[in-house]
């Protein structure tokens, strides 16, 4: 479902030119999660494109006027107008665990395309998604072969009770849910390490999970052909994190 402030032909023009940035939002009990953080990241994406952002008050009003459990707001730029499109996420929400793989498509060099630019025109993300097949998501490596992230998710590993996730210096998007999950884990007494992660570590980890706005913590039980991953702890954390977020709102 799309909702637009201006003519759809202008929106389509902007989308085909790739002049569009977006944010995916999630609501809990009718309240948007991390609205201010999503706005700040949207503002940063627009700043890369030298586009003046909307005021937070206007953004907030827009979100509440189009509220749904999971939604995406796309800002497009055409003919000197900043426009918006709303898309409601209609995918099945409940998922116990998922299968992922490592794609051969590398994350773009961060010096060429900033990792925190959430643009519809990113060729690396698009090409990686074409390799997804029946996987929930595919994990992209960086220019040095390090683990970066999924095409729409961040990656966490659990090894010997320690949580490990690629650092921002690895060339990843500073995921909002990632940030909250790190905070949640530390407040729960777990050790969290942010650093460069080698691909082999994914296969030797005790557990692996993804994080993203729409679904919070998503346990991974299979990477490629390796179907031996436990999801015991990550499944418990998935439920606990949802309750944690609700308490914050």
Model-derived segments and spans:
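Helix-start/capping segments and mature chain N-termini
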Residues: 1-65, 82-249
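Ordered, amphipathic secondary-structure segments that act as subunit-interaction surfaces
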Residues: 69-77, 87
């Amino acid at each position: 479902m799309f909702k637009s402030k201006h003519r759809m032909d202008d929106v389509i023009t902007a989308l085909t030119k790739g002049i569009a940035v977006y944010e995916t939002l999630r609501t809990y009990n009718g309240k948007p999660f991390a609205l201010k953080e999503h706005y700040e990241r949207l503002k940063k994406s627009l700043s890369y494109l030298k586009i003046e952002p909307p005021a937070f008050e206007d953004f907030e009003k827009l979100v509440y006027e189009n509220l749904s459990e999971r939604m995406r707001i796309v800002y497009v730029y055409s003919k000197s107008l900043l426009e918006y499109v709303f898309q409601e996420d209609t995918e099945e929400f409940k998922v116990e665990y998922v299968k992922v793989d490592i794609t051969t498509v590398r994350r773009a060099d961060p010096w060429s395309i900033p990792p925190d630019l959430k643009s519809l025109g990113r060729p690396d993300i698009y090409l990686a998604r074409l390799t997804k097949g029946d996987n929930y998501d595919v994990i992209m490596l960086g220019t040095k072969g390090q683990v970066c992230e999924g095409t729409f998710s961040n990656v966490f590993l659990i090894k010997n009770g320690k949580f490990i996730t690629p650092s921002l210096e690895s060339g990843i998007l500073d995921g909002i849910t990632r940030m909250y999950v790190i905070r949640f884990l530390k407040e729960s007494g777990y050790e969290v390490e942010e650093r460069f992660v080698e691909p082999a570590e994914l296969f030797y980890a005790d557990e692996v999970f993804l994080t993203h706005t729409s679904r919070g913590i998503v346990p991974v039980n299979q990477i490629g052909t390796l179907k031996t991953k436990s999801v015991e702890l990550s499944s418990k954390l998935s439920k606990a994190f949802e309750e944690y977020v609700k308490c914050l709102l």
